[in-house]
């Protein structure tokens, strides 16, 4: 991730800034967060996997950490981030003793995590430092652990619009799905599947049930690469 100071400056306005950027979609951030976690949960259920310990990498203010705990029925969630101010906000907003928040530099990556989740973080990490971030995630996972890697799809005009109008995304460097797959494979992950979500904005919401049928097409505003730690 980028420097601590950058996201410290957005910690208190993060929700408002994101809401303004997402306004064109007709939905709020919770809609997208719940959609990602629900999609992931369905896949895990079909795989027969119930992760006990989950990492929320780049957790920010912690809103998704709560969803991961509740929707995936995890025993514990640890959210890690560079921004100390964002972590302070996360602690204030999350009272469960099953969720902990830690600065990345103070977290020991010990191979105890069953599932690592990361959304919209890597486009903030300078390309030269992305491998280092992936190695941290790899070390954090147990053998056979899964990595749910979500990113904004630069091929989707809606995603580009949101990023162009989001205060903390304007200097982001996006990753195409092929770039992201090459990156995770280079750091010892095996790609299990790639899915594209959030194709239809709210005014076309009646078409949303069809998204499951076309989730392999690179149309959605976000994509997930689900990977396994295999070496």
PLM features: residue spans?
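Conserved alpha-helix/loop element of class I SAM-dependent methyltransferases that forms part
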Residues: 31-50
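A conserved beta-strand element that flanks and buttresses the S-adenosyl-L-methionine
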Residues: 117
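A short glycine-rich, Lys/Arg-flanked "PGG" loop and its adjoining helix->strand segment in the class I
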Residues: 131-143
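Short, glycine-/aromatic-enriched active-site segment of Class I SAM-dependent methyltransferases
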Residues: 153-170
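Conserved beta-strand signature within the Rossmann-like core of class I S-adenosyl-L-methionine
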Residues: 144-151
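Short alpha-helix
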Residues: 173-188, 194
